[in-house]
């Protein structure tokens, strides 16, 4: 099963986080339309994988958005849209959806689902139910969500543009690609953390 359960410290045990990565998605337009129609069966954070640099970046956004939801301070309709917005370094929600969320042209897709008991006491979906829904509705190859798989999908020029990392000569001068990747990851996470400050 390519849907991974992730445990994030300092979140209530009742909140479960599931993540998956799909490559070569053929029906991104359909999935995008489901979000626009606010179809409750498609309440996921659909993130364009081309703007994700690492698992740490992704999980930082998930943690921040879920903490915001737990504290009742969401700025968007739900925790999943909050995750997409938290990926951004700016406060512009529409811009965050456009840059970081799924679009009809998305090729590689990160999917995040956060479950928790409903206010009416309803049981949240299980990992198997979520995976079955994703397998049925996402036309793409599910792969493990590792830094290696993420880096294959990352569009570095796009990331540098969105996070305003162009023109950093010291970053360009780093010869070791792993070191450069780690430095870029730190800059991106820092930009996300400083959003709105």
Curated annotation (Swiss-Prot):
Transmembrane domains' residue ranges: none
Keywords, in A-Z order: Activator, Chromosome, Nucleus, Telomere, Transcription, Transcription regulation, tRNA processing
Compartments it resides in: Nucleus; Chromosome, Telomere
GO biological-process terms attached to the record: tRNA threonylcarbamoyladenosine modification
GO cellular component terms attached to this protein's record: chromosome, telomeric region; cytosol; EKC/KEOPS complex; nucleus
Chief site of localization: nucleus
A Pfam cross-reference name: CGI-121
The keyword Transcription regulation is annotated on this UniProt entry: yes
Subunit structure, interactors included: Component of the EKC/KEOPS complex composed of at least BUD32, CGI121, GON7, KAE1 and PCC1; the whole complex dimerizes.
Family: Belongs to the CGI121/TPRKB family.
Described purpose of this protein according to its UniProt entry: Component of the EKC/KEOPS complex that is required for the formation of a threonylcarbamoyl group on adenosine at position 37 (t(6)A37) in tRNAs that read codons beginning with adenine. The complex is probably involved in the transfer of the threonylcarbamoyl moiety of threonylcarbamoyl-AMP (TC-AMP) to the N6 group of A37. CGI121 acts as an allosteric effector that regulates the t(6)A activity of the complex. The EKC/KEOPS complex also promotes both telomere uncapping and telomere elongation. The complex is required for efficient recruitment of transcriptional coactivators.
Protein name according to UniProt: EKC/KEOPS complex subunit CGI121
Source organism per UniProt: Gibberella zeae (strain ATCC MYA-4620 / CBS 123657 / FGSC 9075 / NRRL 31084 / PH-1) (Wheat head blight fungus)
């Amino acid at each position: 099963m390519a849907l991974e359960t992730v445990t994030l410290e300092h979140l209530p045990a009742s909140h479960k986080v599931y993540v998956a990565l799909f490559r070569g998605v053929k029906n991104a337009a359909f999935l995008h339309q489901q979000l626009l129609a606010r179809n409750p069966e498609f309440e996921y954070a659909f993130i364009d994988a081309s703007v994700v640099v690492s698992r740490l970046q992704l999980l930082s956004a998930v943690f921040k958005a879920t903490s915001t939801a737990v504290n009742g301070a969401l700025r968007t309709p739900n925790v999943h849209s909050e995750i997409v917005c938290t990926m951004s370094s700016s406060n512009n929600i529409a811009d965050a959806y456009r840059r970081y969320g799924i679009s009809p042209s998305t090729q590689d897709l990160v999917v995040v689902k956060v479950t928790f008991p409903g206010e009416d006491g309803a049981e949240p979906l299980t990992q198997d139910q979520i995976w079955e829904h994703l397998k049925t509705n996402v036309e793409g190859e599910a792969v493990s969500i590792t830094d290696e798989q993420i880096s294959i999908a990352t569009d570095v020029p796009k990331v540098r543009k969105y996070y305003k990392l162009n023109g950093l000569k010291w970053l360009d001068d780093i010869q070791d690609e792993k070191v450069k990747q780690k430095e870029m990851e730190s800059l991106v996470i820092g930009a996300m953390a400083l959003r709105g400050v």
